[in-house]
Amino acid sequence: MHDGEAEQDGFRRIFFGEPTIGGRFSALSPFGLVPAAVMGLDLGRIAAEAEVMGEACRRPDAHANPGVALGLALGLAARDGRDKLTIVTSPEIYDLGAWLEQLVAESTGKRGVAIIPVDLESLGAVDGYARDRVFVSLRVAGPWDAAPEETLQA
């Protein structure tokens, strides 16, 4: 839809994004921030936290760089046959898992090697999983259900 059509159709606001930004790079552009604002999220806090993480990921010391640590952990796991990443989130942020699933899927899968993200899967018994999985647990601060965490610890 073009802006003229949107005005004609009575849209209250039109937000323009940079068309060259896409996919995994769009979270902090209007493509990601407008929906976040509509949801009532604190954009100032999101921007501040993103800046902190951006600075941390620019650290030249690999031991102090969380981006390097994450890439290394996932890369080594995949090299050792753990090519499935199961994402477990607390209920308040369950939609984050879908976004991470997309992010991982489009960021890996190069040169015939991929990490397959799995989201919204109910956790089963530990012995029901093959040794091809890596689990990540993301939760918000506060009260939480210990059952998924206990399963992951096993």
Positions of PLM-derived features:
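Extended, charge-enriched "interface" segments that sit outside catalytic cores
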Residues: 142, 150-154
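Active-site phosphate/pyrophosphate-binding segments
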Residues: 1-136, 141-146
